[in-house]
Amino acid sequence: MADGTYRFQQPGAGQFFFQTQPQQHSHQRHIARNGTNSPTGRLKFNHDTPSPSRSPPLSQAAALNPFNMYSQTHQGQHVMMNGGQAHQRFGMQIPKFQSQSHHPHHTQQPHHHTHHNQASHNINHQHNFSSGALASATPHFTPSHIQNGAHTNVDEDIDESMNEHWQQQLQLAAESRQASSPHYHARSVAQQAKGIQIAPSQPETQEQVPDGQNGVVKAKASSRQGWHALDFGGQGLRALSTSLFNYVFLEKLYLNHNKLKALPPTIGQLRKLNHLDLSGNDLTELPEEIGMLTNLKKLYLFDNNIRTLPYEMGYLYRLETLGVEGNPLNDVLKSHIMKEGTKALIKYLKEEMPVHLPPPDRDWIVLDETASSSNHRTDKVTVLSYNTLCDSSATQSHYGYAPARVLSWEFRRELILNELRSHDSDIICLQEIDQGSYNEYFREQLAYNDYKGVYWPRGRAMGMQEEDAKCVDGCATFFKASKFILLDKQLINFGQTAVRRPDAKGQDDIYNRLWQKDHIAVVVFLENRQTGSRFIVVNAHLYWDPAFKDVKLIQTAILMEELTKLSETYAKWPPCTDKAAFRFSKEEGQSETPPLEEPAPSMQYASGDQIPLLMCGDLNSSPGSAAYNLIAHGRLDEEHPDLEKRLYGNLSKVGMTHPFKLKSAYGAIGELPFTNYTPDFKDILDYIWYSSNSLHVSALLGEVDKDYLQRVPGFPNYHFPSDHIALLAEFTVKGKKGKVVEADFGPQRN
């Protein structure tokens, strides 16, 4: 310890390694700059060390004595010796932000750079701060300059703002300014994996010390692993390649301490990011697409030139830390984050977000132009299926990215009603409609549009008080009263139906897993007043949890089994005699209405599978799943993996079959990209199935505009009232095939 202030300049044993890329912070001595009083030679000790309990005066700042080993915040570890840190024999690794009280030469005084006046030095001038220095220096530590060259006075700004939220800002900003060296974060992770704590400007090691020497463990060769982080920090980048944003698996991206002036909108493609560091650049704004990064927990924007933030950042409902120190942020935004923290600012942006322009209308895709252009009367039917997201499920805990107004049922139900009226389909199948909404709103409102409805709530509503039962959701099926006659309606409760099966005795899984789920299907049997065609319309909602694939499969099997029984009953249903639709009496002066065509007689069907079948609903099963394959292929083996060897009577012993030839309506275009759209889940869950032997799909409602989706991370929002989208299909009833009779022209001459 006798060598004092010259100690860190003495050559040590082993080889020295220096940064190959010149950096202003990697010097062995301080270089005099214009307007500074930095020393040009060796200085003696400054014994007038200020108390750690107060900020030191600028004239006695530790920066004026760069060789003072007693300043904890200015250690001279700029050299690696023998592949290790130059100070490794004296220092010990300690937890972050804990004072190193066992180091007698650490005075724990803050480090004010009063001798730097250029804006660029805020980024490029970098010294080593030990972990204990930062904690002990706070709350006194604040850089005396920011990127735009304007000085800040700590005492003026932090009197009221020095709460826990702003303290965290200052601490993280200080850490960020230490991380200006190239690939700092990547090197830190690599060194920590080897058991070494790296200094900010530590050069990369080129040698490994032997096993066990100086407590350093030699890295073991390991197989290649997947990576999820990318560090481009300190590279002087001025632009980013578009290829970068194809790495959609990235979870951490460091672009700090570069020269970026703009962030490309394609940043929105990296939707798995949870950590994004853009500190120390020249950014003046952020793109709207930043709101697509809903998994972000840390977003560092320290030391840029950002004055305002896009409202789309309100979508970042998981964001825990937003670093904005060192930006000329406007007073309103800065006040929110200084006083209440990141969560309050994000909530403010979310609730104040303006309503954007709606997307273009979804295309109407015509698959059979002959059916649309035909002049003769054709037997057509349009069917809409829609999971409306019931009021009790639309909570901030589930949909934190949606403003409070968007989640309010009064707002959403009006959007739903307007959408139903605009499509004006013959049949509507709604899932997740509670009893109160059906009885008090939709049934009344849709009656003005010639609809009649059939509704059943889920099983839990039985035994409840009337007021409580109103909040239980169920399935509602509406049909045009002027076009169809309701012949029959049935409820299928999957759990109750399963326990009534003769083979359910002794099957524990039926009671423990299936019976507890109260999901249902509503079946209506309709007849077209004019053509006499009959339809079985199914409206189903299956269990959602992916961990219960066996339950969804058995629910589907029970549904198809019950439909098989019902279809055979409906095949023997007697003809309908009174088919005239109700008509209001004519008022005086009202013009004569044209007479209706004479209704055709009721169609007769030889078997249940000949009746046109339309099966709609939220099956919570994606294409290729066991439930999907059972419906599409008509059978499923008893040993299917989704059953997980659980016991469900004959369904798991014999297998599952059904006689219907069903196809997905949207299978004609390869299915939609999604029917359920949230930040964490985007998949196909909703379907309109039809019996291909009796129906032909002629038109479909297309997908949501792709450009619109580039700025919207999930539904519901101001234009889509549910996390699901509506499905709409048009079908043409196939004519019955009669017996082919060959004409007899008599004997023919050769």
Swiss-Prot record:
Basic residues compositional bias, start-end: 102-118
Domain of life from the UniProt record: Eukaryota
User: Which regions are annotated as LRR repeats?
Assistant: 249-270, 272-293, 295-316, 318-339
Q: Which GO terms describe its molecular function?
A: metal ion binding; poly(A)-specific ribonuclease activity; RNA binding
Query: Its GO biological process terms?
Result: DNA replication; DNA replication checkpoint signaling; nuclear-transcribed mRNA poly(A) tail shortening; positive regulation of transcription elongation by RNA polymerase II; transcription elongation by RNA polymerase II; traversing start control point of mitotic cell cycle
List all Polar residues biased stretches. Answer: 48-58
Q: Into which EC class is this enzyme placed?
A: hydrolase
Cofactor(s) needed, names only, are: Mg(2+)
Q: Which Gene3D superfamilies match?
A: Endonuclease/exonuclease/phosphatase, Ribonuclease Inhibitor
Under which name does UniProt file this protein? CCR4-Not complex 3'-5'-exoribonuclease subunit Ccr4
Record organism: Neosartorya fischeri (strain ATCC 1020 / DSM 3700 / CBS 544.65 / FGSC A1164 / JCM 1740 / NRRL 181 / WB 181)
